[in-house]
Regions:
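Hydrophobic transmembrane alpha-helices and their immediate loop junctions
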Residues: 1-197
Length: 197
């Protein structure tokens, strides 16, 4: 194989901090299941890209998720490859009796990833679908409204869970994290850099 066929896999330092924290707080069987779910999810993204004939340039694991950088994709192919991660991961649920921990991790990860908030997979699919709209301003406004609605709903749910179920402040961090991430990464519907998360 030539130099051109290699894919760079990068693991950023924040990932090691997350792993160390999880090993201190969670049984190792759950940690292994969680990271297996992440790897499976990314493998389904990679498999769909390869099946559609695209070259994967880099796979980057970060503390806030993983990112696959590929050669530029057509919009429809980008939608298919983005949706392949959560949909493929959900196929693992067919084996839930044999792998209950992995199935729980896959279900939680897929549900979270399908939220229509960019840069999650659901938000990427929504952006891809709305990129077909003629009016880019209307598409961007619709995306912003959907994201704010979902994050607001999550925030109210997290606050209720925190007080009613006495879960502490931790559930509120998820919508706050999403809110910060969407504000930092706002991009127009017109795609110039084709990436699949």
């Amino acid at each position: 194989m030539g130099q051109d066929s290699k894919t760079l896999i990068v693991i950023e330092p924040g990932v090691y901090i997350i792993i160390a924290a999880m090993l201190l707080l969670v049984p190792i069987s759950w940690v292994l299941s969680w990271f297996s779910a992440i790897v499976l999810h990314e493998l389904f993204h990679c498999a769909s890209l390869c099946l559609l004939g695209y070259r994967i340039l880099e796979i980057k694991f970060r503390a806030d998720g993983a990112k696959i950088i590929s050669a530029p994709t057509a919009v429809l192919h980008g939608i298919v490859c983005t949706a392949a991660g959560p949909i493929g991961s959900l196929l693992v649920l067919l084996f839930s009796a044999m792998m209950p921990r992995l199935s729980v991790c896959v279900l939680i990860q897929s549900a979270f990833n399908l939220l229509p908030v960019y840069p999650l997979d659901g938000g990427r699919v929504l952006r891809g679908l709305l990129s077909y709209m003629k009016n880019e301003k209307a598409a961007e406004t619709l995306i912003m409204l959907v994201e704010w609605f979902v994050i607001t709903l999550l925030l109210f749910g997290a606050i209720l869970a925190s007080f009613w179920l006495k879960l502490g402040f931790t559930p509120v961090l998820i919508p706050v994290f999403l809110l910060l991430k969407t504000q930092r990464l706002k991009i127009p519907c017109k795609r110039t850099n084709h990436r699949v998360q």
